[in-house]
Structure formats: C-alpha cells, structure tokens
C-alpha cells in the first residue's frame, strides 16, 4: 500500500526488484 514513486502506465515497475507491484497504474509496496 506504500507508493513507490513510479507509474506503470506504459512500462512495468522497475521497483519490483524491491517488492513493489503495479496497482491502478501506480507502483505500490504493501
């Protein structure tokens, strides 16, 4: 549920490397 400061509208989340995932076009972690 914590925003990772990255969007995933056009490209996947790079922050998946630290546990973030794409939700509602924004990358979140927990």
Curated annotation (Swiss-Prot):
Keywords: Disulfide bond, Plant defense
Cysteine disulfide partners in this protein: 4-20, 8-22, 13-27
Chain positions of cross-link Cyclopeptide (Gly-Asn): 1-30
Keyword Disulfide bond in annotation: yes
Superkingdom, taxonomy of origin: Eukaryota
An example Gene Ontology biological process: defense response
Keyword Disulfide bond: yes
InterPro entries given in the database record: Cyclotide, Cyclotide_bracelet_CS, Cyclotide_sf
PTM characteristics: This is a cyclic peptide.
Description of its domains: The presence of a 'disulfide through disulfide knot' structurally defines this protein as a knottin.
Family: Belongs to the cyclotide family. Bracelet subfamily.
Role played: Probably participates in a plant defense mechanism.
Identification of the protein by name: Cyclotide mden-I
Lineage: Eukaryota, Viridiplantae, Streptophyta, Embryophyta, Tracheophyta
């Amino acid at each position: 549920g914590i925003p990772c400061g990255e969007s995933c509208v056009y490209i996947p989340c790079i922050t998946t490397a630290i546990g973030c995932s794409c939700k509602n076009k924004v990358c979140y972690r927990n």
